[in-house]
C-alpha cells in the first residue's frame, strides 16, 4: 500500500532492509564509494539491531542498463536505492518517486535532475552527496602551475551533462586568467583517444573535469597526452 511505498518495501518493519545499489561503471573511485556506503550503512543498521542486504549491480557504462537495474529494484520492493554516478541517479529518478534514493559520485544535482531553480534541496525522494570540486580554485591552481601556458584544452564527454556544466563554469574563469580555451568533446569511450590526440596537439595544458567516461579511460588518455 501507499504507506509501505513511502519507505520502500515491507522488510523495514522487521528491522531488515533491502538496498539496491546501481553503479554506472567499474572504476576505482566509484568502487570505493559503493564499498564505503555499504560498510557505513551496515555498521549503522547492525548497531541498531537490524540487518541489511545489498544487491549491488554494475551497468557496465551503459545508461540503458541503469534503467533495467533500477526497475528491478523497484519491482523487488527495495527499501532504499543507492545510485552511483549521474546516469544511475537519472535512472532512479525516472523509476520511482516513492523509494528513497541516495546519489553519490554526482557532480551537480540541479543539472542531473533537470532542476532549473536549484537551491540545494530536491524536494523529492532523492538526496545524496556531490563530488563537485571548487572550480575557481582549480582555475587558480592551473595558473599557478602553468603561468606561461597560452592554450588550454577542455577535454570531456559530451554525453555527460555534469561534465558540460563544469566546462561551462570553468571556461570563463580560465579565460579571465588570460588563457585561450578550446573544447574537445568525445561522445563515448570509442573516440576518446582520437579526441585526446587532437587536444594534445592543439593545447599547452589539458583540463579534464570530473567525468565518468574520462575516468574509466584514464590509461587511453595518458597514452596519448604523456608522449605529447
Segments (PLM) and residue ranges:
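Beta-alpha junction/loop-to-helix N-cap segments that form part of ligand/metal-binding clefts
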Residues: 58-117, 211-225
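An alpha-beta-alpha
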Residues: 19, 37, 127-174
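Stable alpha-helical elements in mature extracytoplasmic
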Residues: 29-40, 65-69, 84-88, 92, ...
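Short, low-complexity, disordered segments immediately C-terminal to signal peptides
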Residues: 1-16
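Structural motif
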Residues: 52-75, 184-200
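Pocket-lining segment of extracytoplasmic ligand-binding domains
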Residues: 161-228
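Short, high-confidence coil segments that cap the C-terminus of an alpha-helix
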Residues: 78-79, 149, 203-204
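Extracytoplasmic "Venus flytrap"
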Residues: 12-39, 44, 55-64, 159-163, ...
Amino acid at each position: 500500500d501507499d504507506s509501505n511505498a513511502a519507505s520502500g518495501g515491507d522488510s523495514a518493519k522487521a528491522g531488515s532492509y533491502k538496498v539496491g545499489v546501481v553503479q554506472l561503471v567499474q572504476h576505482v573511485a566509484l568502487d570505493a564509494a559503493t564499498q564505503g556506503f555499504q560498510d557505513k550503512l551496515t555498521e549503522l543498521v547492525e548497531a541498531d539491531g537490524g540487518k541489511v542486504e545489498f544487491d549491488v549491480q554494475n551497468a557496465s557504462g551503459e545508461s540503458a542498463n541503469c534503467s533495467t537495474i533500477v526497475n528491478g529494484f523497484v519491482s523487488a520492493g527495495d527499501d532504499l536505492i543507492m545510485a552511483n554516478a549521474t546516469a544511475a541517479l537519472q535512472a532512479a529518478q525516472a523509476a520511482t518517486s516513492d523509494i528513497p534514493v541516495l546519489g553519490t559520485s554526482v557532480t551537480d544535482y540541479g543539472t542531473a535532475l533537470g532542476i532549473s531553480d536549484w537551491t540545494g534541496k530536491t524536494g523529492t525522494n532523492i538526496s545524496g552527496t556531490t563530488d563537485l570540486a571548487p572550480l575557481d580554485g582549480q582555475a587558480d591552481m592551473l595558473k599557478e602551475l602553468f603561468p606561461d601556458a597560452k592554450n588550454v584544452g577542455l577535454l570531456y564527454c559530451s554525453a555527460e551533462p555534469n561534465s558540460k556544466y563544469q566546462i561551462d563554469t570553468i571556461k570563463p574563469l580560465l579565460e579571465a586568467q588570460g588563457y585561450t580555451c578550446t573544447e574537445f568533446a568525445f561522445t563515448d569511450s570509442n573516440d576518446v583517444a582520437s579526441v585526446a590526440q587532437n587536444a594534445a596537439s592543439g593545447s599547452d595544458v589539458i583540463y579534464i573535469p570530473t567525468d565518468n567516461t574520462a575516468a574509466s579511460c584514464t590509461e587511453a588518455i595518458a597514452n596519448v597526452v604523456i608522449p605529447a
